[in-house]
Amino acid sequence: MSSSREMRDLPLVRLPEPYKTKYELYQASSGPNGRIFQLRLSSDQNNGAISPPDLLHHQMLYFSELIPGPQATLPAESDNTAWARACRSLVSFVTWDGESAPTVGQIWMLVYAIFSLRPSEESFRLSLSGAQKDQLYAECNAAGLSTRFPTPVQPQPLYTTIEDVVVSRAAFWQGAGSPLGTRPAWLVPSISGSARKLPSEYPAFPLQYTLTSQLTNRPVHTQHPVRPAKPARGAPIYSRYIPHLDEFFAMDHLDYTNETHLQLFHTWQNDPRVAVNWKEAGTLDQHREYLRKIDEDPHQIAVLARFNNTYFAYFEIYWAKEDHMGTYYPALDWDRGRHSLVGDARFRGPHRAMAWWTSLIHYIFLDEPRTTCVVGEPKATNGPVLGYDAAHGFHVHKWGDLPHKRSAMVRCERVRFFEVVNFGNVTSNGTAKPSKSKL
């Protein structure tokens, strides 16, 4: 067995709020083909942690580190077909004892552990061995957690048939196979307004159109989809465990009737560091009115962000088509944008910025599966913001001359975001880096 020191070197796997359940990796054995691991429920749970509705660990489930497949011959690097790439990908061998296969949720946790260990891997193979493995293969494929091994474009008589399935990092972080309900695990279930049931208990929100026409200093006249109702004021909407900080990042729907929420916004907007860019310094009553208007506006939502239980930032998330952004950019029906400020200077720095920047965009793409682009309008000379955006897959669509500034009209496609971002560790200067394998 590994030493306790080696165990501490392995990353924790933690469910998001409201569960915060902690799981630990244990090395069961080691051999010439690498180490064999088991994911166990930690005996050292933090205060407030609760068990998920279904058992997500399996006492008889073991998996290997990612290692090269057993094939004697691999396709040449010049063959870049899906079949050839899958042949060359690393594989985890998964075994279990007993008469029943693990659940899809338990395989999801195993995949979560592997991506926590190897966040830079875009995909890998799972090779299952145990009772009802064919049924489990089919269930994982049906949930989108995995896909069948690709078929070669041309017959390959020199290669044996591979029954493994392929797991995609992009699919996993979009919520494929999530065991915590019909929405991705990182979206915290919350009631909308005075509703008695979760929106996720109903069919997907229908597509129907309405018209927004307002003649203000930034005129808007556009047809766009009717937007879903916002979560209840004060409700949590997103949560994710950040391994390199050993903290949870979360976002709550700001409640302008809550004096604590209002006072935070008021204090931050009157900070000269914030006011120079936001230009919203004012009285408490002015800020209450500002937030009330956002609360009543279906095209945007005000959000407070926190690490663990300490609020540090304010975000505005908007639908681009009925925003003034739509005047400068040909927004699609479900495109969204965001504005952000860090109000608590203790939480500045690239090691934290990378965590919340990733999470904010992650939330936007998860909240509405039809959102294909996230857009923005940072000041064209704001190098740090443009740098963080670029690290997350954004590119400058064009310059936009707004009444108060020249902006870089940036956009990031869903496909690009989930290709670029690995949700892994970061360096001391905040740039993303692959985790060193601890396996």
UniProtKB/Swiss-Prot annotation:
Keywords from the named record: Acyltransferase, Peroxisome, Transferase
E.C. designation(s): 2.3.1.-
Keyword rRNA-binding among record annotations: no
Enzyme class: transferase
Gene3D superfamilies membership: 3.40.630.30
Cited InterPro entries: Acyl_CoA_acyltransferase, Acyltransferase_MbtK/IucB-like
Biological process annotations from GO: siderophore biosynthetic process
Major localization class: other
Disulfide bonds: none
Domain of life according to the entry: Eukaryota
Locus of motif PTS1-type peroxisomal targeting signal: 437-439
Entry annotated with the keyword Acyltransferase: yes
Pfam families: Acetyltransf_8
Subcellular location: Peroxisome
Function: Hydroxyornithine transacylase; part of the gene cluster that mediates the biosynthesis of hydroxamate-containing siderophores that play a critical role in virulence via intracellular iron acquisition during macrophage infection.
Family: Belongs to the lysine N-acyltransferase mbtK family.
Protein name: Hydroxyornithine transacylase SID3
